[in-house]
Amino acid sequence: MFVDLAHETYPDKVWLGAHEERDFDLVNLGSSGGKWAFDYTGIDIKAMNWAQQPQTLLEDYNLLRHFHCILKPGGYVLITIMPFTGLNKNTGLMDAMKYAKFDVQGDPIQPYMFEEAQRYAAYPILFKKQALKALIRYLMGKDKSCDTERRPLLDHNPMDVNELERDAKRWISGWKKQFGIDDMDAALTEENRQGREYRIQLMRNLIDFCTEHGYKPVYVIPPVTEHLAKYYTPQFEERYIYGYLKDVGRDVMLLDYSKDDRFRLDDNLYFNSFFLNKRGRKLFTKRVLKDLGIH
């Protein structure tokens, strides 16, 4: 429920008091796609992976605003771009609870229901019915996915071809339900169009923050397996991914690996149809650093 209870992933006040490291070369932001795309362990670079599963763009922005002090001048901020980064998502109590244990000053990472989240974090017995239901759903998901939690640590794909095909269909079906999409090639619904406008401005704010503080923002589109990528039609990609970045209207380097067959066609670099496994993350991270010219 709470992220970074050991204060090792994010440089909050506890981390800063326990570590002397500063002048980091790079941080990456993002949701699940970023969390399972980058792994800097064993690489001669000072970098942090600030992505979480899940994590909104607003939370990305606020994490950067709170913790950017560890970056060196000219440091890179990798912004992971996923299929629906350009659409807004509803947040709830569990989103606010994720960051309730952070030791930060100023605005919270997730302002929505922040005071409630703080109260519940301190006094769980006060959980209301709504919060208790959310907690039960969360814990049930954790209980039934012990094997799933181990999968990202594998260096191979535990799924066979048929399982990968079914997994890809589940992702597509889930996204359609989450964002109210019937046809992925159709125009945006009014609700998604409004969410797009919000996300455009939010991304502009994030990019502008980077440039104003002397950092180098970079869009990164990680690869997915062919089992999932085949559902991303040119119309879909233009409308939901590239069109969104164009509408943001900022001059930002784009590293796009969605068509890189070295990753896309090798199922054994993933732990499902979507996310890179331990070996895949290592290879992908080295590739990104090489393309940035910093490793």
Question: Model segments located where?
Answer:
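C-terminal regions of proteins
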Residues: P234, R239-H295
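Membrane-embedded segments
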Residues: N28, G33-Y120
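Short beta-alpha junction loops
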Residues: I81-T85, P223-E226, D260
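Secreted/periplasmic serine-hydrolase-like ester/acetyl group-modifying domain
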Residues: M94-F209, H213
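Active-site segments of SGNH/GDSL-like serine hydrolases
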Residues: I207-Y232
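N-terminal secretory targeting modules
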Residues: M1-D25, I70-K72
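Well-ordered, non-membrane alpha-helical segments in soluble/globular domains
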Residues: Y61-L64, R196-R204, P234-Y244
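A general structural motif
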Residues: D23, K72-Y76, G214-K216, D251
